[in-house]
Amino acid sequence: DRINDAVYDMIEANIRNYAGEKKHLLITGMAADAPMERVSGKLNADLSEFNLETGRDMISRAAVRRQLAECDGIVLVEEKGVSRYSLVQQELELAKDMGIEVLGVIVV
């Protein structure tokens, strides 16, 4: 994993700070399954006060869009060399259109 413990600590602190009263969060993005699972597993273990869901690729997967509609905020997980700027832009626009705050982006 390219993200070390110190970086995860910072990510967790930022999620807590930016989430405020938002407790139902979606971890999503265009990262491949393996890095998405690593990040979501670590965040689920360390952010137990949140209801975290994970769903990869809200652009083309209807099930993930349904998850998005139920959440208070999202954290994007993007992968160097995999995620494309145009798709990330679509993710940001979709969240904005639905009134769902993007709390941050994790690049793995």
PLM features per residue range, with description:
Residues 1-108:
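P-loop NTP-binding module
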